[in-house]
Amino acid sequence: MVRPGQPGLLPPSQRTLAHAVNRRRFLKSAAAVPVFAIGCSDLQKRAAPRLAVQRVRAGDPGWPSESDWQRLNAQIEGRLIKVQSPLAACREAPNSAACRELFARLKNPFYIGGEPGLTQTSGWVDAWTSAPSVYAVAAAKTEDVVAAVNFARENNLRLVVKGGGHSYQGTSNSADSLMIWTRAMNSVALHDAFVAQGCAGKQAPQPAVTIGAGAFWLQAYHAVTVKGGRYVQGGGCTTVGVAGLIQSGGFGSFSKNYGLAAAALMEAEVVTADGVTRIANACQNADLFWGIKGGGGGSLGVVTRLTLRTRELPDYFGGVFCRIRAKSDSAFRRLTARMIRFYHDRLLNRHWGEQISFNPDNALSISMVFQGINRQQAAQTWQPFFDWIADSPQDFSIERPKTIIDVPARYFWDADYMKKSFPTAIIRTTGAALPRAISCGKAITVRRAGSCMAANPPGCRLHY
């Protein structure tokens, strides 16, 4: 019998809500009952999920002894590093010459990538603070990764993996941890007709490239595009690590045309938490293969190498660079609205990528790159927007005149070609002629040391 007020007397449209409320009340009541007040409490405790694991930290009683670390070092042939943060000099003496020299070096993202104690980002919206590991295994081969994973598991240690150090979530660093630093695992090998292991007869051969987990995208682009005449979808910033980008999905400058970088993944070698090296592809360990294409770097294992499908190059890569300042807040609102509308109407297509930024100083910075069209076509696309700017000189000023370039696609990441083709964009640093990245007609320093080799801002960090 249904009593007044029970769900059965409610209109049909309200019954689902009433049942949901009752379920919520039941769950809240059940959650409030102490575990020990229920029969079979031991069984319930054993069945309860472990929501957190307490790892051993430096200084804890269970922290490995010096002899333990030495045994690990011997196992990996002397590649264990005691991590020291270069920032320590600035904490101790912020006005010292050493600190000033460090901050000059920090302008070069390739220097940051070469230091195990540094990260390219820190404190994304103040959510975390970059902190160096205690030790790092400077892995040179898969066996080094296996040794590090086993050591961390057996000693209940925090374990982090760093390639490029670009993680916005801070997953490539952690205090009191052991780091697997993959920077030295940076080999690149091209294939004319690659078939994943176990996929013979199930998968058509594809042009592909196998890349070590520690390679930066600059190394991949140089091998695949400059030397090989092919394209592999990767990151817009060339200091990003290949493995981390793939495991995060992999959006890049030309993703509107080529898709996410993870979509090109054909196979990966992964060391899982049990210390086993596994090959993951569509034909074996398919669930792991699916998971690493977006699960986040190091979430499901340590990727040691990846094989990615390559594509034909377009005729040109190029870019449009400019900086426009509005002379009032109301003019900036007009500029913002116009830019968004123009982007929607003219740039939201497969040819265009990378960024437009709206700055607090009422300035609009344009650093757009393109593929599949040439300089003349790019100029025609943008002409209506720049005509609109020119019609209102009382409201807008051009801080950096527009620069539109195109480059035969094969040479987009070729420093020697850039030096020959853009001689006005050359500087000399420590006696060597180096290319500059061109942005809105102003040269921006690009440093060698495996440095940015592109005449476009997405190829490097901007330094004005």
Predicted stretch roles:
Residues V2, G8-Y464:
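Soluble FAD-dependent oxygen oxidases
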